[in-house]
């Protein structure tokens, strides 16, 4: 059989399209055969069953007694109970309200008319997620017209030279910079180091760090994170 034709036949057999999601997956070139596929059916059924349990709110992290529900944040309607659903909606509404007030100037820094820049401090997913969104949605400014929103900078490691470069780029605009510190636990060492270095940068310019900083953390650690910011 012609090689191209055999590839096409295999593609037709193994191309997977999920109705309603717009997601398609081509596994035809992965090199497995039918016997392997058949042998995996039991394992796949177990995996799908475990996923269904997670969707239903099963505890997946016994150390912290936590469920896994990152995707509930995108669609609170699928959260396993009303309490979680209401908490998610409440927090999302609060975030939207805060963001709107920052962008329209109702929340402003102590020494400037409004915030023009955002400095996000986080490690791992606390920085990677926002970086992905910022780079994907930033867009390209039109000629002689700047983009709306805050120009965003990231401190996502403990490299002192990297931090110094960012502080240099911000320069005098540090007084117009909103600092966002993200740590689920409220005590991530790398994130804390970045926050302390940034606080020192503010101090060197006689700026009130606490007046321009906000923390995103787990509810259990809110007071500790606030004490660190205000300290």
What positions do the PLM features span?
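Glycine-rich phosphate-binding loops that contact phosphosugars or nucleotide phosphates
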Residues: 100, 113-224
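A short, hydrophobic C-terminal helix/tail in secreted or cell-surface proteins
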Residues: 225-231
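Extended, charge-enriched "interface" segments that sit outside catalytic cores
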Residues: 1-110
């Amino acid at each position: 059989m012609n090689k191209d034709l055999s590839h096409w036949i295999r593609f037709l057999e193994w191309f997977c399209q999920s109705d309603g999601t717009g997601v398609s997956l081509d596994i035809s070139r992965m090199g497995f055969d039918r016997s392997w596929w058949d042998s995996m059916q039991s394992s796949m059924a177990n995996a799908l069953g475990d996923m269904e349990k997670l969707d239903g709110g099963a505890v997946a992290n016994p150390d912290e007694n936590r469920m896994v529900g990152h995707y509930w944040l995108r669609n609170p309607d699928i959260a396993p109970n009303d309490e979680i659903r209401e908490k998610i909606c409440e927090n999302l509404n609060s975030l939207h309200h805060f963001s709107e007030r920052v962008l329209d100037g109702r929340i402003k820094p102590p020494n400037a008319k409004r915030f023009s820049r955002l400095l996000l401090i986080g490690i791992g997913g606390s920085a990677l997620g926002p970086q992905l969104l910022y780079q994907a949605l930033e867009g390209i400014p039109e000629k002689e017209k700047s983009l709306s929103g805050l120009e965003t900078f990231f401190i996502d490691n403990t490299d002192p030279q990297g931090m110094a470069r960012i502080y240099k780029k911000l320069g005098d605009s540090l007084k117009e910079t909103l600092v966002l510190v993200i740590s689920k636990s409220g005590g991530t060492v790398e994130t804390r180091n970045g926050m302390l270095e940034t606080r020192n940068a503010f101090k060197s310019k006689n700026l009130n760090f606490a007046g321009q900083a906000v923390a995103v953390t787990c509810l259990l650690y809110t007071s500790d994170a606030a004490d660190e910011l205000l300290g």
